[in-house]
Amino acid sequence: MTETVTDQGKQRSSKLQKNEAAKDEQVEGKGKETLESGTDKSAEQNSSLLVGQPDVIDNDNVQTVDDFKNLMYKMQETRRAIVFALLNEKDLTKDDVEILKRAYEKLTDNQTHSFQREMCTLTTKLSVNIGDETRGLEKDLKYLDALMNIRREEPNLLWPIIMSRVDLFSILANYHPKGKETFLKEYEDTVKFLKTFISSEAITGKKPIFITDWDGTMKDYCSQYATNLQPVYSAVGMTRFAASFTRISAVLTAGPLRGPGILDLTAMPIDGPVMFSGSWGREWWLSGKRVVHQDGITDEGFNALQRLDDEMKDLLHTSDYAPFALVGSGVQRKVDRLTLGVQTVCHHVTSELSNRYQMAVKERMHRVDPNSQILVFDPSTELEVEVVAHNSGIIWNKGNGVERLIKSLGDSLQSPGKILICGDTLSDIPMVRQAVKQNPDGVLAIFVGAKMSLREEVKQVIGDESRCCFVSCPDVIHAAMSQILNEHCIGK
C-alpha cells in the first residue's frame, strides 16, 4: 500500500470496485430530490431533465448550460466570501448579498416554471430541475436578511452573538419534507444527541471526532451533481461546530475532490477545521495538498483515466452531448474511475440519445485504450456508467478512508473519546464499522432519511439504540448544530 502527496492538479486512479455499498450511494445520489413543504411536489417528481431532439435552435432569451453553470459557480464564490466574513469578524458587503439576490431572481424568472428551467446548447433545448439550487438560495437570503437586520440595529455586536439571535429553526422548518411538527421532534432529539456527543470532552479530557458523508447527509440531494452547492447557513454552522467541539472533523464522500468535486461545491474554507475527501476516502485534501491512496492502481491506469477525462471534456464541449454535463452525476473524475451520468431518475433522456452517448464514450475509450487492456466499461446502474481502471483486486470502502485519515493525522479512534459518524446509505456503514472496531462503546451515529432496514443495520452495528439518531433531512442537523452553538455562545 502506498500513499502519495501531490499538488491539486495531479491525479491518480484505482481498481474495479464492485462494492454493493458504493453502488448504493451512487444510485441514491443520482438525482434524488429532497422535497419540501410549500413546493410543487408533483412537478418535481415528474421532471428532472428534459432533452429535446437535436436541431439548430433559436437561443434568444434562453440561458445556455454553460451560462447556468457559470452563474452558479460565481454565486458560490460569493457564498464563500460571505462565510469567510462571518467566520472572521469582517463586514458583509451589500454587493455580496445583492449577488445572491440577483442569482435567485435569475433562477426564478419566466424561464423557470415549477422549478423546471429551460436551457439550451447550440443544438438542443432542455429543461433542468433547479429546485435544490433555488431553495438553497431562498434559505440563505432569509438567513442573511435576519443577520443584517440585527447588525443594523446593533452594529457593535460580534457575529457569533448576532448568529445566536437568529432563529434558524424557524427559517428551515417550512422546508422539512414531513412538516413542522416532525421537524421540531427530530430537532429536539438531535440537540440532545449532539449534547451527549460534545459532553464527552468533560469526561474523557479529549474532544471527540466527527466524520460525515456529504450528499443526502449534510447536503440535500440535487438533480445535478455539478451544481449541488452548499448554502451559507450550513457552511457557517458546520465550520463553527467543528472548530468549537471536535478535534477532528471530516467530510468523506464518494464523489471526487475536484472537477467539479466537494472542494468546488462546499462553501466552507477548504483549509479550515473541516477536512475533505473524495473517491470513498481514497483522496484527501490535507494541509493544502491532495493526498492520494493508490492501493492497487497502476501508472497505466492513472494515465489512461486522465486521457479519457480530457476526451470527455472535449466530447461535452464539441458535440450534441453537452446536456450530459448536467445529467445526474455528470462527469466525475475519481481516483480509480470516471463516473458518467447517462439517465435521470425520471428517465427524461431518450433511450436513443443515452445509447448514442454511451457509444461515443466507448469510442473515446478505444482512442485511449485500443486493445482494451486497461479500462473497463461498467454499466453500473440504469442512471450512470463507470469507466474503471483495471486493479489488483483490492476492495476499497469508506471504512478504509476513515482508517487512512486517522493514520495520516497520527491520531486514534480508540477510547477514551467519542466518535460521531453521519450517513444516509449502506455505503456509509463501513465508516461505522471501522469506528466500532476501534472504540466499541464510544461511537454515535446520525443517519438521514434511512429506510427501516438501514436503521436496523445501524442499530445492530452500534449495539446501543441510545447512541443512534435518525432524521428526515440534513437541515435538522444544521438547525441542531446552530442551537448548540447558540447555547455555547450565551454560556460564554
Swiss-Prot record:
Impact noted for substituting residue 336 to A: Strongly reduces catalytic activity
Residues holding substrate: 332-334
Recorded consequence of changing residue 213 to A: Loss of catalytic activity
Any one Gene Ontology BP term: carbohydrate derivative catabolic process
Annotated cofactor note: Binds 1 Mg(2+) ion per subunit.
Required cofactor names: Mg(2+)
Active-site residue numbers: 215 (proton donor/acceptor)
GO CC terms of this entry: cytoplasm
Swiss-Prot/TrEMBL catalytic activity: alpha,alpha-trehalose 6-phosphate + H2O = alpha,alpha-trehalose + phosphate
Regulation affecting activity: Inhibited by trehalose 6-sulfate.
Family, similarity comment: Belongs to the gob-1 trehalose phosphatase family.
Record's protein name: Trehalose-phosphatase
